[in-house]
Amino acid sequence: MRYYVVSVQHNKDKDAENRSVPKAFDTELQAKQAFHAQLGDDMSNATLDWSVCMIFTDIGSVIASERWEVPKPEIVI
């Protein structure tokens, strides 16, 4: 079985969505390591306001999915 990691990101400066090319791995451990690295990259990218990162298999099973977004400022009235 093959494992794939993909990230969908929203660039707040360009108001555009980007999807990374799925990266393929032979083991679930390799995919999980890449998943956490990608999520870390997304979280440190100042031009993004949200991203969704996921691991899925070649038979369509989703192993992990994580959504990250920039915290919204609190409005105090």
Predicted features and spans:
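Short aromatic-glycine-(Arg/Gly/Cys) micro-motifs in beta-strand/loop hairpins
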Residues: 1-21, 49
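Generic hydrophobic secondary-structure signal
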Residues: 5, 30-33, 44
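A generic structural signal for ordered secondary structure
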Residues: 10, 21-26, 55-59
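Alpha-helical and His/Cys-centered functional microenvironments
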Residues: 13, 34, 42
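A short, exposed loop/beta-hairpin motif centered on an aromatic-Gly-Thr core
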Residues: 16-33
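Short, mixed-charge low-complexity intrinsically disordered segments
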Residues: 37-77
